[in-house]
Design a protein with these regions (language model features):
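Surface-exposed, glycine-biased beta-strand/turn segments
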Residues: 43-147
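Short histidine-centered loop motifs in beta-beta connectors
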Residues: 115, 158-182
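Asparagine-centered strand-capping/turn motif at beta-strand->loop junctions
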Residues: 17-26
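Active-site loop architecture of trypsin-fold serine endopeptidases
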Residues: 135-143, 188-200
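Short, hydrophobic/aromatic beta-strand segments
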Residues: 26-34, 122
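Acidic, glycine-rich catalytic/binding loops that coordinate metals and/or anionic ligands
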Residues: 82-86, 95, 141, 147, ...
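Short, well-structured beta-strand-loop connectors
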Residues: 119-131, 172-188
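Low-complexity, acidic Ser/Thr/Pro/Gly-rich terminal tails and inter-domain linkers that flank the onset
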Residues: 1-13
């Protein structure tokens, strides 16, 4: 067992069967192989064990176990695009879009220049899987590239939203918590590789090497709820 992932081998009659399952509430992707064989990626969904392999044991032979290697990551493959709620309440012009020349080359990523401390809202419901908000500085030096504050949230389809450049202490959620679409999750800042206060968002899927890659996003505005005025 490895965290929320379990890989087991069981004897069923004359067959040795390899099973994989996840205890997490969201999809995970497992890349596994027998020693010397090519890795095979498999998406595991909650509550649905998957048979990875089986072999018939020769009569009179010992119960030969599979020799297996595997790695895994939260998320799913095959997601083509995302349609999600806008992460900011007030309409504003995008400062840099997908494949932007400044820092979005080869990426579907989206930036909005907003004052530090602007509330960030969850683009879709999901589980918080990573949080970093201890960094304090920002700038354009190469050392800044790994010093951005961020929140990562995985959705029910296995896509993962990344909210980046939060202010110091700007995360209002913690790892393991479930958030709903539109819920405040943090506050914008200017940490990491940044030329000024802004919010950077992207949504990723996993490829067959279980490496994240960004996907196109369509944003919609949440409707404003009218309130009765006495």
């Amino acid at each position: 067992m490895d965290g929320p992932l379990t890989v087991t081998q069981t004897l069923a009659g004359d067959q040795m069967v390899v099973w994989a399952s996840t205890a997490s509430p969201y999809p995970v992707t497992l890349s596994w192989n027998e020693l010397g064989e090519r890795p095979q990626p498999v998406v595991l969904t909650p509550g649905q064990p998957r048979e990875l392999a089986s072999r018939v044991l020769a009569l009179g032979h010992a119960q030969t176990m599979y020799q297996i290697e595997y790695v895994w990551a939260p998320g799913a493959m095959g997601i083509r695009e995302a349609r999600v709620a806008h992460p900011l309440s007030d309409p504003m012009e995008m400062a840099q879009g997908p494949h932007g020349d400044f820092s979005h080359q080869g990426k579907f990523a989206y930036d909005w220049a907003v004052p530090e401390g602007t509330v960030i809202r969850a683009m879709a419901s999901g589980w918080v899987i990573e949080v970093e908000d201890r960094f304090t500085d920002g700038g354009l030096g190469s050392a800044m590239r790994d010093q951005a504050n961020y929140i990562h949230i995985i959705h029910t389809d296995g896509s993962i939203a990344r909210y980046v450049h939060l202010m110091p202490g700007g995360a209002d959620v913690s790892v393991g918590s479930f958030v709903t679409e539109g819920e405040p999750i943090g506050r914008t800042g200017n940490t990491g590789f940044s030329s000024g206060p802004h919010l950077h968002v992207e949504i990723v899927r996993l490829n067959s090497d279980i490496w994240p890659e960004t996907i196109p996003i369509t944003f919609f505005r949440r409707p404003t709820v009218a309130q009765d005025i006495p």
